[in-house]
Amino acid sequence: MKATGEVMSIGRTVEESLLKAVRSLEIGLFHLYDAKFDDMTETQLLDYIQIGTDDRIYAIAQLLRLGCDIDRIHSVSAIDAFFLQKLSHIVQMEQLLQEHPGDSKFLKMAKQTGFSDKEIGLLWQMDEKDIFHIRKQHGILPVYKMIDSCASEFDSYIPYFYSTYEEENESIVSDKHKIIVLGSGPVRIGQGVEFDYSTVHAVQTIQSAGYEAIIINNNPETVSTDYTCSDKLYFEPLCVEDVMNIIELEQPDGVIATLGGQTAINLAEPLRARGVNIIGTDCDAIERAENRDSFEKLLASLHIPQPKGQAVTSIEDGIRAANEIGYPVLVRPSFVLGGRAMQIVAKEEALRNYLKTAVEINEEKPVLVDKYIRGKEVEVDAVCDGKNVFVPGIMELVERTGVHSGDSISIYPTHSISEKVKETILDYTQKLGLGIGIIGLFNIQFIVDEFENVYIIEVNPRSSRTVPFLSKATGYSLADIATLAILGKSLPEQGIHTLYPKEKERFYVKAPAFSFSKLHGMDAYLSPEMKSTGEAIGYDNKLHRAMYKAMIASGIKVQNYGTVVVTLADEDKEEALPLVRRFYDMGFNIEATVGTALFLKEQGIRTRILRKPSEGSEEVLDSIRAGYVSYVICTRAILSGIHYEDGVAIRRCASENNITMLTSLDTVRVLLDVLEEVTIGISTI
């Protein structure tokens, strides 16, 4: 299994349900059409569909557009002809729409088949809004059917609805004041069930405040899609069209878009443009936090420093910006979640390669180039009511900047930053919450350099993935506090009169969980792009015991014996030396690739030399596969070439053989602290 999550859609036909599911996936596709298959021949497409992949269905749709016979597709793919006929019906509907632009009869047929306004607009060369107006003009509007959870055995009313284009509407609209909460959609790397935690708590708070609480979501794994959770549940795609249809029916007092992660917050501006009342942090505040120019101006006005950076719209602009800022630089596309396509580059050649191959860069899709500052990363989740700010806790991340915060071990309360730095962080958090205009939750990530200078990395004007962890660690239910603030109850009215409460005396540690052994092809090297698929928590009065518990809970094997395989980038060798020596002094056997082994031997550490694949041998891979290795330490220097390929092969081999893989020396340091604590006091844990 490779999937990290799933969506569910409900309709009256297979075609309708399938197309709703496709646009629920949030992969940038709104229909059974993927442009990457446009230039492939029928023969190439038939070869492609022999193997089951996540995008095979789009290749099959393209084959049907080319006129390929269903029986032939069935014989190649082994997909039942029943389903292929449904795909064929969708493709035939496309052709009918193209032949009858503007025809309301075919528009209704397309909507009953599950076509989105966006796709119909593309086929008719019209705007999505125009299709909506044509539908409204001809009365082509969805109705909502109730799921019968009792299979007609007896009458029941379960407030659990899906849309379809028929006649009778079964969703009875009440005259109560109501609030719609937008869910977070499918679980994927970068956006998990942490956001559903906030959604569910918000619904409970909305209900206790006397409102009718309505959820829109499409993920069957979540608590929010349990029909007993809210007053009404709409199981629909989180797209503007589908959400807007529900809003038109329910006429809510407001819509909350800041608790469902980036999925929900991306809907805020399109909904506002259609006259929807977005409550909590408004669209202007979201723009101030997420728009590069607006955010930089705000920071300058508040005298808050951030790493130098520029938004660039071409490759040459990117090269020029990096030369002005100075290498190394951190590059990433704007408006992403989970650090997708984010990298640290140290040379012009690597930057040019990144801008050519890793991202799409143009006027509409700028790429951010920032100075990379190596330092300690600190994170806060906070609540603002428009006049007051509350910071329940400050979290310190084990791994330095360069590792995505979602992949880093997180500690509350902080253990190695000074009171002066804490005061600065709290001051900046308060200024930013009020300056941006936050109403509800927000998250800030900071860098603290070796001179105790504090820089802002980013502000997320929404709930974050650390809200459940910090809520459990501090005892403050952040989602509840934030929801009451959104509904107009100030922090003092909630009994909160302080910026920062007294820290807990015990330590809470959040450790990431990875699925590298399942996700073949993914490099296990920790980087600015998030890769973890889960997390676990550990707590204890002693820091390293809390870390031990969190590591064990997250699936990390913590062994105080065995062999450590080491392969280091040249720039990491001096820093890694005392760490490897600590393993050696604890009785571990040390094995290393040639360059690393020679360095360690010169320093008096007995080391067995292993050759790499690029040297014509699989010694290092065979050693990892043999079953006696406890840890593999593998750091990375560059993003291409034989050394990089060797590193990928070593990391993949460790992951596939379920051996603890460490790519950050900060994680190695913490593991050694844990091993020393466990070895000395294991009986009391």
Which residues make up each language-model segment?
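ATP-dependent carboxylate activation and anion-phosphoryl transfer catalytic cores
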Residues: 1-106, 113-114, 137-138, 142, ...
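Helix-turn-helix DNA-binding helix
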Residues: 84, 131-132
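Hard-cation-handling environments
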Residues: 112, 116, 126
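Long amphipathic alpha-helical scaffold segments
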Residues: 128, 142-144
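ATP-binding N-terminal substructure of ATP-dependent carboxylate-amine bond-forming enzymes
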Residues: 133-136, 145-304, 313-320, 539-683
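Acidic/histidine-enriched active-site and ligand-binding environments that engage anionic O-linkages
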Residues: 320-329
